[in-house]
């Protein structure tokens, strides 16, 4: 979504804003046939549709921005919630509530302004993906969904599952990484958690919206099979596991057609092949037509006044009256909105306005657990971490670590309970401001450091920081990379001369640990000179406490990378980012010539050695994987093995199962086929059994819309990362065909 500050134009007060008739009470509605909870959502939808007027149907497919736009001649609907993302009128006489929409994937966001909501923020989506734990995804989703409901919202624009094809993408921090199985599983679990609160979650940004530069104008070129085995597979898995009520189509074009009027994406794949029964909503400003958009699968225009025109509403009514859009299609559009509302109990268990009864202390523990489980220990020479007792002087340097932790920017921005830790940071317009959550790593470290003197230096003067480092027993440098919606980073280097700062500090004291607060991968020219590196991502509301607990060993790090960290930008499929950020209206093509070879698959295919591979993550303990076996029966590959904690402390292991086809059959040498995360005490062992989705063993066949597994010997490997195999076996698979959904 795009925020108010980025708008250039438009629009007066909303249509359909006349006073509605007084809503009947729930008791008065109880006898209506569509209120019978024993009927299916589909049956109830058809019953209530028959009672609706044409205008009421048109109401359901037109959404408005929930924030006033000063100087733009737009006032939000009075029924909307202030500084919110969106609002859709319901049909109160029939018991159909309004839709109150809030961004986004890490919590209840607010549009920038004087009266922001202060809410709990999860860590970044990238952090949650790095947990490799769907239970963590579900718990976080359930928590932010509860806050949304308590804040008066019944729809969250959460569920970003765009694959990380482009490491410089400013929104990567919102997403679930580069692998379709991992991303789809984690995001699907989060959607399920959100919707457990009887609200709708939104799978987005559909599809192939993998960079911010030129996002409104670029055209993605990729063939059907490649998309089905990569980006679309991530959406397919998230849809299957999360069952979202809505899907948000994206800004970009795909094969020359805008995503929000693209019949291939919306009608053929999403609604046809996958059987999606909910509704498709546009991103804010992503609708471009009336007839084409409606007929090609868009069900709801969102975010008036961001589009150039009100394409739905009166214009859609005229198109139906003239036969340009069939009446049956309008009924389908409104029916899909109603279906989602019935299916996810927005009608049976309606929100009743903001309650502000949030248990922030309890929710802080949920987000803290997510942060702790997603942090990735990338280097730990000579067991520099966890921090040992008996140190006399500890230096903490950089990135406002004295007061808080960084978050990602844009429409997903959650404003912290207690206010921003650092005031006055830009940008002054969208996607700003830069927000630090008031959870101080320095205070968390001081609380655990015993009699050690803990000194903070802001890092603005590398020479002064180096002098402090030289006089300290241990140095912890906090480094940051702010990323946000609406722009991509120019390169993967840390900004603000931080590489020079880290190099100077490490030269002064080799007992230096670096804590990274980044949206994704960064380069590390100083890596060989530091003792330890902890990737903390954007760690959310309780991030400072979580960092302190991991640094001191109260929590054993168990995160594993959901993306590849390249050694240089020259290793990427596109070393230079397509498009020109200085010419945002330039139309251009982005050719995904790598096809389905995204992330680690590209590195495997080209024989490239990354800085850190996909799936990588160290621990304060050690694990072994033994007894690997693979068995094919009844069209299903099952893999089993035993994990043992061979170290001295408790920890969690992420066992990764990779599968490799007979040579040359796939887009890359191997694919992630399954994964399992387990907590084990020292000396404890446990047998694990996982199943590999048949689609991950197959090639997609566009001609007949099937997945075909070729007969032959397949290699099955249990590994600690994409480049760290522990054991391998071969298994003979027969030629097998499954349908478009892997059945």
Region roles according to the model:
Residues 1-16:
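Gram-negative bacterial Sec-dependent N-terminal signal peptides
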Residues 18-699, 706-723, 742:
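Glycoside hydrolase catalytic-domain context in secreted enzymes
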